[in-house]
Amino acid sequence: YIGGNDSMDTIKKLSDYALLVGSDIKFMGVPKTIDNDLAVTDHTPGFGSAAKFIAATMKEIIRDGLVYDYPTVTIVEIMGRNAGWLTAASALARGEDCEGVDLIYLPEKVFDIDHFLERVKEIASKGRSMVIAVSEGIKVMDGRYVFELSDHVEFVDAFGHKQLAGSAKF
């Protein structure tokens, strides 16, 4: 089976169960995750194409903001509960034909709301549109996810993980 952390956990449970009941069925897991968060790897299958997609999408969003006669603020929330690789890939939008995103916030670093607002005001004072990339898993100093600071409804996925969404909404 090919999959991420939850899939590998399922493979382990199936393998353990097969041993328990004396079955000779063997289960094999091939790790793959776009989060790029598997230990002892340089990069994981799936990450490269996802990173390319993020960079291309961010470039399109940046260009979309250029059509307005007034400055806009666009916050894009990107997957990454505990790993900011995909959000960091938004920096790849920068090139000869694009200035890139203005701000990037990763889950590996505490999110400071006051500092964030200062940076937004600083960029806005220049009279231009901005695009901000935030990971779904950014947290404030007390450990709460940013999305928990707004009116949110808690959902869990099929594996029982709290679905993180709404950081950009906050």
Label the predicted regions.
Residues 1-3, 9-28, 44-170:
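Accessory alpha-helical/coil subdomains and C-terminal extensions
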Residues 35-43:
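Glycine-rich, charge-decorated loop segments at or immediately adjacent to ligand/cofactor-binding or catalytic sites
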